[in-house]
Swiss-Prot record:
Signal peptide region: none
The keyword Cell division is annotated on this UniProt entry: no
Pfam families assigned: Ribosomal_L20
GO cellular component term, pick one: ribosome
InterPro entries documented for this protein: Ribosomal_bL20, RIBOSOMAL_L20_CS, Ribosomal_protein_bL20_C
Name of the protein in question: Large ribosomal subunit protein bL20
Gene3D superfamilies, sorted: 6.10.160.10, Ribosomal protein L20
CDD domains: Ribosomal_L20
Gene symbol of the encoding locus: rplT
Length: 119
């Protein structure tokens, strides 16, 4: 029985890795072993980055809401608490968009939150 060396499979796998490593500097884009290590690490960083992006955007939205709420005389935590007591469930992304693009609607939400905090 003839020996099978997986020539096609190996070549395809190596070409795939080198294609992913395109644009890397020096040996990282030319040599399979070095490129494989670089690609593995970059895929790991990409995975971590996708998780971090969600945290970063949430922090950005909260910062924007806080700035807009303080401009209307209420802190972020009291504003969110007032909205919860009022039964208004708008996510932070939408609140930050409203704070930037639709100030009148945001001001109405602030007034509603203030009313429900005092009640």
């Amino acid at each position: 029985m003839a020996r099978v060396k997986f020539g096609k499979v190996t070549r395809r796998r190596r070409k795939k890795i080198l294609k992913l490593a395109k644009g890397y500097w020096g040996a990282k884009s030319k040599l399979f072993r070095v490129a494989n290590q670089a690609v593995m690490k970059s895929l790991m960083y990409a995975y971590i980055g996708r998780k971090l992006r969600k945290r970063d955007f949430r922090r950005l939205w909260i910062t924007r809401i806080n700035a807009a709420a303080r401009a209307h005389g209420i802190s972020y935590s009291r504003f969110i608490n007032g909205l919860k007591k009022a039964g208004i469930e708008i996510n932070r992304k939408m609140l930050s968009e409203m704070a930037i693009h639709d100030e009148k609607a945001f001001e109405e939400l602030v007034n509603i939150a203030k009313q429900h905090l005092n009640a």
